[in-house]
A protein has these predicted regions:
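Short helix/loop capping segments that flank catalytic or ligand/cofactor-binding pockets
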Residues: 60, 79, 110, 137-139
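Active-site metal-binding motif and surrounding structural segment of the metallo-beta-lactamase
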Residues: 66-67, 77-129
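Short, small-residue-biased leader/transition segments that mark boundaries at the very start
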Residues: 3-8
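Long, low-complexity, polar/charged, intrinsically disordered or flexibly structured peripheral segments
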Residues: 9-35
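Metallo-beta-lactamase
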Residues: 43, 129, 135-197
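Short, solvent-exposed secondary-structure boundary motifs
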Residues: 29-33, 49-53, 178-188
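Conserved beta-strand hairpin/beta-sheet module of binuclear metal-dependent hydrolase folds
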Residues: 34-94
């Protein structure tokens, strides 16, 4: 694991000690924090793996005959790259050939440069697929509503508080927001309901 992920994990060590929730934390949030503290690479079913606990969403790796199909490359390139390295180290090195964005939330697309490059996509080595209307939704959510949502998140999740039972405990989706750069490579294909038939 990287030094950055080690620091991230150590900040929330107070949740890993199996203690009951202190008076300063709602028991439901404490339990959610303990569950979010469980991180690693998990087999969902044969050939399908998820890295959990490294970001506020999960990244899915599907083994195919010609490499990885990745679903939702997380929030930042650093967390996505760490999870791809984890999958390759544990399961064997495989090239990435397809990436699917399931929807327009930044925690499902922002880490794209951790699993591929614009050059790989431009060369036709990687396909990126998203739902119909995806780019419009990305603009609506991240450019139009983004500043308001970012401001609200400071009140909602307490990211400026120190990680402790008296400060920032968990944000529900994960331990805390990952730090790092988020990017977007537009999909070459936006699927419709018709494509699924």
């Amino acid at each position: 694991s990287s030094a950055a992920s080690d620091v991230y994990k150590r900040q929330h060590d107070f949740l890993r000690k199996g203690k009951k929730s202190p008076e300063t934390v709602h028991p439901g949030l404490w339990r959610q924090g303990q569950l979010n503290a469980i991180h690693g690479l998990f087999e969902v079913t044969e050939g399908v793996w998820q890295a959990r606990g490294y970001d506020i969403s999960n990244i899915t790796f599907i083994e195919t005959s010609n490499g990885w199909l990745i679903i939702d490359p997380l929030t930042t390139s650093s967390t996505a790259a760490a999870c791809l390295a984890l999958a390759n180290n544990v399961l064997g090195e495989r090239p990435v050939h397809t990436i699917i964005y399931t929807h327009s939330h930044i925690d499902h697309l922002g880490g794209i440069l951790g699993v591929t490059t614009q050059e790989e996509v431009d060369a036709g080595n990687i396909r990126i697929i998203a739902p119909a209307g995806f780019l419009e939704e990305v603009v609506k959510e991240n450019i139009i509503a983004g500043p308001i949502m970012a401001r609200r998140a400071h009140y909602q999740f307490g990211p400026l508080l120190p990680a402790s039972p008296q400060g920032q405990v968990d944000i529900g989706l994960g331990q805390s927001f990952p730090l790092g750069a988020s990017h977007l490579i537009p999909p070459q294909k936006q699927s419709t309901k018709q494509d699924q038939n």
